[in-house]
């Protein structure tokens, strides 16, 4: 009753195959060893081999040619491609599928990569250094340079005002001085070359070179006895007494 039309009773191999007596690979749907037909159907359904496959329950996958017994499976691995799946060892499972290749920069492990980034940031080692090795970051280096520059004395850098420093007022620019001392300094510097024989007229400074060519001012200007200032332009006693201690901001901003 259970036989198909084209297979007679004498086909022992087929009946053994369907009864599960022949040992077959697990992918070949042999009859599971079950006592009755109902549990047999349930076992087939559990294996994914439902007699009427639907969308939710797909049918069995196509068997490869080697598993279906259509070809001999040669053990040679060289030569042309064979369509038989070479068996794996016991307990060996297939690995994950091929993944997209890694970016070459990230081939290093994250530990080595972070160490490289740290070296790059501190400029201590690695490939991206500024001046050789051991130099800190650019902003740190700039801050160090600015601090050293500010700490240098004023006569080297001219970076700070002489009015607020305790340096002596010898050879000081008059623009850096408080107004009264700037006046004295200008008086010294203007008449340095020609000799100071005429000086102040109506509260203004008149050097000798100007007073000779002025319109009538040479006649009106009284010749005052002037103390000779030496060529070294040393400061008067009066001025140097005032400037033994450095002037404050209030004295710098006060009017004449």
Curated annotation (Swiss-Prot):
Domain of life (superkingdom): Eukaryota
Sequence segments annotated as region (Disordered): 1-38, 51-75
Protein name: Uncharacterized protein FAM120AOS
Source organism (scientific name): Homo sapiens
Gene behind this protein: FAM120AOS
């Amino acid at each position: 009753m259970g036989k198909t039309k084209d297979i007679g009773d004498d086909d022992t191999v087929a009946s053994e195959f369907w009864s599960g007596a022949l040992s077959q690979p697990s992918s070949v749907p042999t009859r599971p060893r079950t006592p009755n037909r109902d549990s047999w159907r349930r076992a087939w359904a559990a294996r994914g081999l439902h007699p009427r496959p639907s969308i939710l329950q797909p049918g069995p996958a196509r068997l490869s040619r080697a598993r279906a017994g259509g070809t001999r499976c040669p053990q040679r691995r060289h030569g042309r491609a064979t369509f038989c799946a070479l068996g794996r060892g016991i307990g060996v499972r297939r690995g994950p599928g091929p993944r997209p290749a890694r970016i070459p920069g990230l081939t290093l492990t994250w530990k080595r990569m972070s160490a490289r980034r740290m070296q790059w940031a501190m400029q201590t080692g690695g490939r991206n250094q500024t001046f050789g090795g051991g130099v800190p970051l650019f902003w740190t280096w700039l801050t160090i340079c600015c601090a050293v520059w500010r700490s240098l004395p004023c006569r080297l850098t001219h970076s700070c005002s002489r009015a607020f420093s305790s340096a002596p007022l010898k050879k000081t620019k008059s623009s850096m001085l408080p107004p009264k001392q700037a006046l004295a300094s200008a008086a010294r510097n203007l008449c340095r070359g020609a000799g100071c024989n005429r000086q102040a007229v109506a509260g203004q400074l008149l050097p000798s070179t100007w007073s000779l060519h002025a319109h009538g001012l040479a006649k009106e200007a009284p010749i005052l006895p002037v103390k000779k200032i030496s060529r070294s332009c040393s400061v008067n006693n009066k001025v140097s007494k005032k400037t033994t201690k450095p002037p404050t901001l209030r004295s710098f901003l006060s009017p004449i």
